[in-house]
């Protein structure tokens, strides 16, 4: 595939599928680390799972910021920065010694891991396709669901085999081995580069303004995301003998 070839858009689909799967999967794996971490430090379930809340809020806030940066400068290095951030943070979690460090690291994961790899890269995929962008975006976004299915399972196996601290280290190494090479494949679509350099007003025949559309979609997405928060606690009942 050549950079200027529209078929390179499918390379971007694979790249974003993989990176979003790793990012979403790591967020979901908090549910697997919840029990061993809370038992070692005698934290309550609520205290420990609050890390997921912190990561979610930081991902949302920084997602807006990174989206602005992507519009101005492109996303070519977003994948590499996100990959390095995820690896570094997962490795740092292995040396956890306080709940405040736990919150800080997951805040950073949301801000510099998830936020870099979600919406900015999804937008990148959309710009590669003038036809069937919905299909391409749907495939790319499905990587998040696949990651949520497999990464927690792999994390559980690693925890059982070597403990939660070593599991974080192994995850960091796996993430770096997968994400770094694939992140180097990220390219901007020629159409987006041209549009950014030659800004012009696009005429649209649509009853709602752009701001109204964004507001309604954001409102809907918030409720969709709220429904996923409960899975943070789903692992404990299945691993606790009453």
Language model features: what each stretch is:
Residues 101-115, 222:
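Hydrophobic core of transmembrane alpha-helices in multi-pass small-molecule transporters
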């Amino acid at each position: 595939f050549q950079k200027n070839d529209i078929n390179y858009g499918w390379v971007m689909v694979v790249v974003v599928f993989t990176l979003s799967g790793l990012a979403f999967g790591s967020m979901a794996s908090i549910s697997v680390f919840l029990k061993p971490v809370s038992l070692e430090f005698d934290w309550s379930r609520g205290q420990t799972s609050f890390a997921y809340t912190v990561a979610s809020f930081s991902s949302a806030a920084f997602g807006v910021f990174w989206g602005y940066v992507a519009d101005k400068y492109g996303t070519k290095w977003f994948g590499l920065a996100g990959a390095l951030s995820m690896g570094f943070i997962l490795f740092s979690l292995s040396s956890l010694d306080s709940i405040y460090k736990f919150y800080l690291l997951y805040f950073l994961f949301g801000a510099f891991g998830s936020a870099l790899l979600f919406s900015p890269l999804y937008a990148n995929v959309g710009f590669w396709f003038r036809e069937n962008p919905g299909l391409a975006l749907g495939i790319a976004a499905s990587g998040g669901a696949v990651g949520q299915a497999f990464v927690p399972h792999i994390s559980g196996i690693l925890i059982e085999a070597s403990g939660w601290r070593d599991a974080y280290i192994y995850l960091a190494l796996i993430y770096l081995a997968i994400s770094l090479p694939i992140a180097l494949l990220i390219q901007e679509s020629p159409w987006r580069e041209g549009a950014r350099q030659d800004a012009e007003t696009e005429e649209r025949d649509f009853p709602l303004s752009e701001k109204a559309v964004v507001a309604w979609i954001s409102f809907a997405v918030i409720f969709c995301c709220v429904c996923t928060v409960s899975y943070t606690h789903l692992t404990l009942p299945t691993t606790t003998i009453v």
